[in-house]
From Swiss-Prot:
Listed GO biological process terms: formation of translation preinitiation complex; regulation of translation; translation reinitiation
Pfam families hit by this protein: SUI1
A single GO molecular function term of this UniProt record: translation initiation factor activity
Keyword field: Protein biosynthesis, Translation regulation
Entry's family note: Belongs to the SUI1 family.
Protein name, per record: Protein translation factor SUI1 homolog
Lineage, top ranks: Archaea, Methanobacteriati, Methanobacteriota, Thermococci, Thermococcales
Entry annotated with the keyword Protein biosynthesis: yes
Taxonomic source organism: Pyrococcus furiosus (strain ATCC 43587 / DSM 3638 / JCM 8422 / Vc1)
């Protein structure tokens, strides 16, 4: 018999998971000397990285992708990314910006 999950319980569980994610934000040099911002530490099994990347790209007006368990955004967005991740429900104390 399949287990019936209350949608409210599932939402609360996801909120708790968001508050426990240790997230690291840093930059890397891409091709031709371009900079890209990397976001690591979001559990791709629990959260849709593509959806999070889509929201961040829209807010930051940049390109990017979600691959290999991390989000890559074109350009240096370290100064704004922490605030945006907090708006998405992640805990500010667990976001490390380098």
């Amino acid at each position: 018999m399949p287990r019936i999950v209350n949608p409210l319980d599932e939402m609360l569980f996801k909120e708790v998971l968001k508050e426990q994610q240790r997230i690291r934000v840093y930059t890397e040099r891409a091709r031709y000397g371009k900079i890209k911002t990397i976001i690591e530490g979001i559990d791709e099994k629990e959260f849709d990285l593509e959806e999070i990347a889509k929201k961040l790209k829209a807010k930051l007006a940049c390109g990017g992708t979600a691959k290999n368990g991390r989000i890559e955004l074109q350009g240096d967005h370290r100064d704004r990314i922490k605030k945006l991740l907090v708006e998405l429900g992640f805990s500010e104390e667990l976001i490390e910006v380098e």
